[in-house]
């Protein structure tokens, strides 16, 4: 290949890495730390897809199988860093998922993953591997120190507060984060730390449990060249501290070539090569493809092992070349050495223990308390979200206020009609404002819980419950602000007790709307779809259950039965009784009667109550109990849904 001096760690870019003494399982010195090994033996993964669209019933049994991984075997030891190269769709991320036990249920996995010669069981993967994904899923309104502090509280049982804080400070120092410890994480709209620093925070969160095997899915994605190089050098340093580091990478610079202990190349799920940088140069030289001088070996070998699909001729030509190289590797001494190392570790008389992460997590309620504090601190710092949450109902109420101004007692001037219209809006709009809050705020927390639950920090339902508990005081305050302004200004029933009942009756649908949205967000990934579904359910509930548009007693039996399962029925009856009971109406001048104007049929509020919802007066307390029973029912349903989500995603 020519002079490789420009590719060494001390080359032109000045990438200095302490190579240290790589721990080797073959004759390791007595003073070396405990060595560990990771082996993947004959890993294959395939998924099946329907031949035609889902609506084509005739083809429901016709499927085609796509092979994503094909007989991949790798071996790496502690103190080493392995880089996995490959074009898009080559199977790099799937291979990491296979290593970490995160493959989906939709496919079929064949092969074994060995750590220290022991085949891992499904429940052991989570406790053995730390996995840093491409995207940094962090809460933007927390500082770096707070982010790591809360992660540590979730991962490690708190003992001595001093030693606990020292752990966080030590990890920040190890990853050069101390100078930004008190800065917010931030996001695209909120200033914060840089993208490279966010990536280091994600790595630091994993280091808190002292993992011995760390996996990184394209850790340099979205970073500039210098920052990407710094991240790779950091990972090399982590590997030198008796860890196994495996990462996928996209278009690395040539200066990094000699930093990796092993380099693997995938093409369409097949392992084209896996060995040291020196072995790679010799192997491709022997295949007749020497890397040109002054070329980036990563780019050269990536192009060499990729299939060009721009034309049929080029596809055939490049496919033959890739197959030739893959066949040569399978027959090479490098491949045989990999298989031999795995088999040797499997048959040791005394197998080393599997290096699990620090596993001393706190109890369920302790984790729930930590999550509640973290969620509250993160959301309270979002000033716009807090203002929106508190004033959203009020803004809707101001529109009603300007439109109606003040209700009257004269039936001919809309005394009943205005009140019914207001109650209809109260019942229909309050669940929707709750839904808007959840759709706006919870998806970020859901993404965090999806990742952290796979890391074994907690279960997804705990994040959902923490959010639900966080919602309660904000919802109470928001409802009281709305009620205080609208109730008295609109001139509704002038009794303080009635005001209290009114506020309590509106708090329930607001919470129900938000909790119903949480349940659906546990089922449906797209928040826009959840928005539409909740809106449709709210509209349907008001139409069927409120009795404002059509008397429930006059509805067809199926709709009448459905109305009993809508919270709008009970909320509407409470509001109607609360407002109309004890009211007396006038009907124009004294000489106007029912015979001259049918609208004068209702001169007392009780008459309207008995006409629209008979017996609601005697059911007032029961309606409150039933209305508020929807809240714990939705919370329990949400826990079940998120437990199922946890099972589906984590397994």
Swiss-Prot record:
Cytoplasmic-side positions: 1-383, 443-467, 522-528, 645-651
Drop me one GO molecular function for this one: ATP binding
Metal-binding as a keyword?
A: yes
Q: What is the effect of changing residue 437 to K?
A: In STSL2; loss of normal maturation of glycan chains
Q: How does it assemble?
A: Heterodimer with ABCG8.
Give the comment on domains: The Walker motif (consensus sequence G-X-X-G-X-G-K-[ST]-T) is expected to bind ATP. Within this motif, the conserved Lys is essential for transport activity mediated by the heterodimer with ABCG8.
Name used for this protein in its record: ATP-binding cassette sub-family G member 5
Source organism of this protein record: Homo sapiens (Human)
